Every structure is written in structure tokens, then in C-alpha cells.
């Protein structure tokens, strides 16, 4: 199954199970910034334990690897679980929505984007930038994550809520990376 087919399958399964979601990560930064290849799909979901079986029904064990116990545990601890396409190796990382103020804020700011003939809920460009900066910091300065954030900023410049970005860059302790991004964008 191609990544596009996998993405369609995920969105249809989430919509059918009525699980609120938001696409995030490199697939969204490629949409909002500069396209780059990525092997996984990141999805933030607001799923209750009772919905897990409905979601899993869409992913046959003969085609996808998943562990029901790990999934239920991830729902309990508001962590993450993944599904792996056994044929193509595509990976879907499902991140459970937490009570973290930034998680709640970015989830409330998601918007609909038409892609592959489907309407999908995606992260706002501001939140994509902030998450990429946070991952850059957590990974010890990942240039790939920083560059993704920079490219989203460059493409979306003039349409971004700069006050929101400043507030959360400070709150998330990524203000130095945010300033570096602004400096590099000015030079370009």
C-alpha cells in the first residue's frame, strides 16, 4: 500500500470511528512548507478506550502489525502506539491527546485541508513550526526538524500568528531556536 493509500485508509478509519484527529509531523510540514520524503505518518488523536476496537477493525492483522495490549496501555497513559503496514513497511504513529496546555491548544487550532480527494484535519502552520522546534531541541539539535520548521515559516510568512508563535516558543522553551529560525529566514 502506498503512503497515499495508507493515509486515505487512516483518515477513513478515523472518520468512520468518529475519532477526532489531527495530522501532524513531516507529512504536514511537507504540505505547509517544503516537500520531503518521510516514511511515517503522525496523527494526534482524541480516542477513548472504547473506540480502539472500532479503529483496529479497519487494519486487518494479516496486513498490519499492531498489538492490542500496547494500544490499550497507550490510551490509558495518553502515550503513543503504532501500526505497521506489513507489505510496504509504512508506519503510522498515533499520539494520544493529553491534558498538556500546548497539546490542547494545537488540537483546538487544527483545520481542514483537502488532500488526495479527502478532507483531513491538519495541524496549523504555527503549531507545525512549534512542534518541529520542540523535536529539534529534544533530539539535540536535529537539522532536519529545524529545517522543516524554517521551510514552513518561509512558505507561510505573512499569514502566521506571530504573537501565538512568540508566546508558545517561550512557554515550550524553544525561544532560542525560534530566534535562530527568524534570523535564518531574514538572511534567505
Q: Model features per residue range: what roles?
A:
Residues 1-188:
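Compositionally biased terminal segments of proteins
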Amino acid at each position: 500500500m502506498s503512503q497515499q493509500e495508507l493515509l486515505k485508509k487512516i483518515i477513513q478509519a478515523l472518520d468512520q470511528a468518529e475519532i477526532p484527529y489531527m495530522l501532524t509531523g513531516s507529512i504536514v510540514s511537507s504540505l505547509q512548507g517544503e516537500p520531503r520524503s518521510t516514511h511515517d505518518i503522525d496523527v494526534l488523536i482524541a480516542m477513548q478506550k472504547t473506540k480502539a476496537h472500532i479503529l483496529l477493525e479497519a487494519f486487518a492483522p494479516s496486513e498490519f502489525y499492531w498489538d492490542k495490549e500496547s494500544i490499550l496501555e497507550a490510551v490509558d497513559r495518553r502515550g503513543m502506539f503504532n501500526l505497521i503496514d506489513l507489505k510496504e513497511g509504512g508506519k503510522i504513529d498515533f499520539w494520544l491527546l493529553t491534558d498538556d496546555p500546548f497539546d490542547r491548544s494545537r488540537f483546538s487550532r487544527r483545520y481542514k485541508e483537502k488532500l488526495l480527494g479527502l478532507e483531513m484535519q491538519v495541524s496549523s502552520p504555527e503549531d507545525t513550526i512549534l512542534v518541529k522546534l520542540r523535536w529539534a531541541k529534544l533530539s539535540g539539535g536535529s537539522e532536519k526538524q529545524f529545517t522543516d520548521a524554517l521551510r514552513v515559516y518561509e512558505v507561510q510568512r505573512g499569514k502566521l500568528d506571530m504573537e501565538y508563535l512568540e508566546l508558545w516558543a517561550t512557554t515550550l522553551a524553544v525561544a532560542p531556536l525560534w530566534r535562530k529560525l527568524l534570523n535564518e529566514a531574514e538572511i534567505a
